[in-house]
A protein has these predicted regions:
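N-terminal accessory segment detector
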Residues: 1-184
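Short, thiol/selenol-centered motifs that function as redox-active sites or metal-ligating centers
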Residues: 185-194
Length: 208
C-alpha cells in the first residue's frame, strides 16, 4: 500500500472527524456520503461536485454556529514552528501588540524573501490589510486573506472581477469552480477563515 500523502483523503478525514465531534455520527454519515472513492487523483469535477452536495446537506442539517465551527476546524494550518518565537514572547510578556508586530514582520519578510516582492508591492499589500497578521484595532484583529501568492501581482493588475476571483482563491480542492458558472455554498469558505483562527490560537494558547 502506498504511503504517499493524499491531501484529499486527509481533508475528508478531518472534515468527518469534525462532523463526528460537533454533530454526531448520523449527520456525519449523511454529509459524507459519496466521498468514499475520492482521492487526490480524482478529477476536480468530481471533488467539486461532491463538495457542493456535501455543503448543501450541511446547510440543511446543521445550524450556522456549528457549521462555522466545523469548517474552520478543517483549515490548512500555519506551521507551528514558525510561530514558536511569537508564542513564547507572548507567553512571557502578555503583549498582544508585540505579538502582532512580530507576525506582521514575519509576513513582510515572506513577501520579500520568498515571493520576491519589491517595497512598493509590499506596501500595497500591507495597506490593503492582506496577510497573516491582519489589522489590529483594540482587541480585535481583522485578517483579510491575501490573494493566492503565486497570482498576487496578476490580481493587483487585473481589472476583470471574474478573473480576479479566480486569482484570489487558495483552495486546491474547489478553486477551479471559479472558472465556471457554478457556485458552492459560502459555508465552505469558513475553512479558509480557520487558517487565521489557528494562527492566533497557537500564539495565545487559547480558543479565539
Amino acid at each position: 500500500m502506498s504511503e504517499q500523502y493524499d491531501f484529499e483523503r486527509a481533508w475528508l478525514a478531518k472534515f468527518a472527524s469534525c462532523l463526528d465531534e460537533i454533530t454526531g455520527k448520523e449527520i456525519r454519515k449523511e454529509v459524507m456520503k459519496g466521498s468514499e472513492e475520492l482521492t487526490s487523483h480524482s478529477s476536480r469535477q468530481d471533488v467539486i461536485g461532491w463538495s457542493q452536495r456535501a455543503m448543501e446537506r450541511l446547510d440543511i442539517l446543521v445550524d450556522g454556529t456549528r457549521r462555522r465551527e466545523i469548517m474552520t476546524s478543517c483549515a490548512c494550518q500555519y506551521p507551528k514552528s514558525e510561530l514558536r518565537d511569537i508564542r513564547e514572547e507572548y507567553a512571557t510578556t502578555g503583549d498582544l501588540d508585540l505579538a502582532h508586530r512580530m507576525l506582521q514582520n514575519q509576513f513582510e519578510l515572506f513577501l520579500k524573501n520568498s515571493l520576491g516582492f519589491g517595497d512598493e508591492l509590499v506596501e500595497e499589500t500591507v495597506k490593503r490589510g492582506w496577510g497573516t497578521a491582519g489589522i489590529k484595532k483594540g482587541n480585535t484583529i481583522l485578517a483579510t486573506k491575501i490573494p493566492k501568492s503565486g497570482y498576487l501581482i496578476e490580481y493587483v493588475s487585473e481589472t476583470d472581477p471574474e478573473i480576479k476571483r479566480q486569482y484570489y482563491c487558495h483552495c486546491p480542492r474547489v478553486r477551479e469552480i471559479l472558472k465556471t458558472s457554478k457556485t458552492i455554498s459560502p459555508t465552505y469558505c469558513y475553512c479558509g477563515a480557520g487558517f487565521y483562527k489557528g494562527i492566533w490560537e497557537e500564539i495565545l494558547q487559547k480558543p479565539v
